[in-house]
């Protein structure tokens, strides 16, 4: 697994604290969204996304990893296109409004082909 060092986050990734957050996300990953019940609400204080190249079954591909940093120090991560798209917009919104804490709802759905997918909502 190779990290391509492209990071988008709600925090400054150039500071020591920001770099530690990214390091912890990349090396620890946290709990997978797959293990969360539908509708789980995470009291978050940061979100980050980074690209990594994964080699699954000899098929190398670049993927976006999304990590939500909970206020209690927990990390929640997903490799999911729908989560990545929602999180990218959420990062922009949180950054634009300078939110220090926010509630993220993890939503689970099923596609017309029966595949389970995840997305994010901002909870009030």
Swiss-Prot record:
Coiled-coil positions: none
Keyword DNA-binding: yes
Keyword terms of this UniProt record: DNA replication, DNA-binding, Early protein, Viral DNA replication
Disulfide bonds: none
Stored Pfam families: Phi29_Phage_SSB
One GO BP annotation of this record: viral DNA genome replication
GO MF term list: DNA binding
Top-level taxon of origin: Viruses
Signal peptide feature range: none
Assembly, per entry: Monomer.
Role played: Single-stranded DNA binding protein required for the elongation during viral DNA replication by strand displacement. Displaced viral DNA strands are transiently coated with the ssDNA-binding protein and therefore protected against nucleases. The latter is then probably removed by the replisome that performs lagging strand synthesis or during the events that lead up to the recombination process. Stimulates in vitro DNA replication several fold. Has helix-destabilizing activity since it removes secondary structure from the ssDNA in replicative intermediates.
Similarity comment: family membership: Belongs to the phi29likevirus single-strand-binding protein family.
Full protein name: Single-stranded DNA-binding protein
Organism: Bacillus phage phi29 (Bacteriophage phi-29)
Primary gene name: 5
């Amino acid at each position: 697994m190779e990290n391509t060092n492209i990071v988008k986050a709600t925090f400054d990734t150039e500071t020591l604290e920001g770099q530690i957050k990214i390091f912890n996300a990349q090396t620890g990953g946290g709990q997978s969204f797959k293990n969360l019940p539908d509708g789980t609400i995470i009291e978050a204080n940061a979100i980050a996304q980074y690209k990594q190249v994964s080699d699954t079954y000899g098929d190398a591909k670049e993927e976006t990893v999304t990590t939500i940093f909970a206020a209690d120090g927990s990390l929640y991560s997903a490799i999911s296109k729908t989560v990545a798209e929602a999180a990218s917009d959420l990062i922009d919104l949180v950054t634009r409004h300078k939110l220090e804490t926010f509630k993220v709802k993890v939503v689970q759905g099923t596609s017309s082909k029966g595949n389970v997918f995840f997305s994010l909502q901002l909870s009030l």
